[in-house]
């Protein structure tokens, strides 16, 4: 029996040897010992929020959609919102699988990335389920990023950010390479999921607040819960990489990130103006200027940068839904406050 035992104890993982990136000497297949407890907490919280769109009845939404009780402007907001989200979730999922996962060398962080990729698939399924339920032209909705200029501009911007990281020869073992990787993380976690998506949530949840399209609203609430964890994981990942590789956090990189976020804010304002040429449900396109700038400042602060807009939140009810002021940055507080989906009240 003794001959069956291999002399491999030296390959057991040392916790202090683990790093988020550029750590190929540590066996990424060994989950334990867990070093980055924040990554594992995000994974557990994601699993606690498990849901599927088909669990949510759409009968009242179908009845309302087929009636004359929605204005053309209200229908426009819903259709353009679905047009953006239907492919945006796929872009995020593809970026996780094809760009981020291979360059993250920590198993607990990878564990969460796998969970997140599944959730992006569920979200894409959600938009198909909504289209099927309402009898919408699915091809038109899912092709909106080729037919609507404001949606295409946002998605093209995202693809610019991920282009270099998708190159098969891309590496993160240089300062420049790791800086490019961090910009990718900013583009998808901070901008796409933390700015573009939150603006879209306001539009649809405004219907839900007035007891309209309540099935869609409930699904967006579940997506918002998921995306809040995605955002927090992304921020912790960015800050963790900064902490382990302080040489990358140069004034030049910081300014590049600020400029990316400024561009994103401008693009989101243009999209809001396309969605809302006239006011509905107490929403006006001008309100989204303040809101997008407000949440952009909050995202900048959470990765250690100064706010640039200093605008107030015109939608305080969104802060009541997911209180941005109480989101805890792991690297500032070492505390993560989440509630399981089953215990959340709306």
Swiss-Prot record:
Q: Which gene encodes it?
A: nrdB
Residues reported to bind Fe cation 2: 120, 193, 227, 230
**Cofactor entry:** Fe cation
What EC number(s) does the entry state? 1.17.4.1
InterPro entries in alphabetical order: Ferritin-like_SF, RNR-like, RNR_small, RNR_small_fam
Entry similarity comment:
Belongs to the ribonucleoside diphosphate reductase small chain family.
What biological process terms from GO does the record include? deoxyribonucleotide biosynthetic process
**UniProt-annotated catalytic positions:** 129
Please tell me whether the keyword Oxidoreductase is annotated for this protein: yes
Q: Example GO molecular function term?
A: ribonucleoside-diphosphate reductase activity, thioredoxin disulfide as acceptor
**Organism of provenance:** Chlamydia trachomatis serovar D (strain ATCC VR-885 / DSM 19411 / UW-3/Cx)
Sorted UniProt keywords: Deoxyribonucleotide synthesis, Iron, Metal-binding, Oxidoreductase
Q: Tell me what reaction this enzyme catalyses.
A: a 2'-deoxyribonucleoside 5'-diphosphate + [thioredoxin]-disulfide + H2O = a ribonucleoside 5'-diphosphate + [thioredoxin]-dithiol
Cofactor remark from the record: Binds 2 iron ions per subunit.
Listed Gene3D superfamilies: Ribonucleotide Reductase, subunit A
Do you know which PANTHER family this protein is assigned to? Answer: RIBONUCLEOSIDE-DIPHOSPHATE REDUCTASE SMALL CHAIN, RIBONUCLEOSIDE-DIPHOSPHATE REDUCTASE SUBUNIT M2
Q: How does it assemble?
A: Tetramer of two alpha and two beta subunits.
Q: What EC class does the entry list? A: oxidoreductase
Quick one: which residues bind Fe cation 1? 89, 120, 123
Name under which the protein is recorded: Ribonucleoside-diphosphate reductase subunit beta
Its biological purpose is as follows: Provides the precursors necessary for DNA synthesis. Catalyzes the biosynthesis of deoxyribonucleotides from the corresponding ribonucleotides.
| SUPFAM superfamilies for the chain | Ferritin-like (SSF47240)
Spell out the Pfam families in the cross-references.
Ribonuc_red_sm
